[in-house]
Amino acid sequence: MKRILVTGANKGIGLATVENLLQNHPDTFLILGSRDEKRGEEALELLTLKEPKWADRLMMLAIDVSSDDSVNIAAKTVVSSFEMDAKPLYGIINNAGIGSSSIGLEPTLQVNTWGIHRVCEAFVPLLEASGRIV
């Protein structure tokens, strides 16, 4: 089973990506990354209501890509959840992002630029040799 982390997966493109992978790639296990745990759990519920058998192929992971601590804790959670595998991930899909210019440049950079860097720094060591990053 190929495990793939999708950040920003509780709505929009991220949620659609998770659903598409579940529908079209039965050999995948999706780690649904969400900054907001409640919305992440709601996304899991929505997916499992659509298709109950997906429940065995899903996990919600609390991760705020704008926070070093949150990303590092999330990486440790993945390691402990799949401790039988030294390299528990096949893929990382860096989807988390914000688009509002009204909040200013700094928060946008923290998520859209530095967030990708943080996630890659923390999770690339967990990738299989043939793993992929998007």
PLM segments and residue spans:
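The beta1-alpha1 cofactor-binding region of Rossmann-like NAD(H)/NADP(H)-dependent oxidoreductases
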Residues: 37-38, 62-76, 113
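Conserved NAD(P)H cofactor-binding loop of Rossmann-fold oxidoreductase domains
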Residues: 95-100
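Catalytic Tyr-X3-Lys loop
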Residues: 103-118, 134
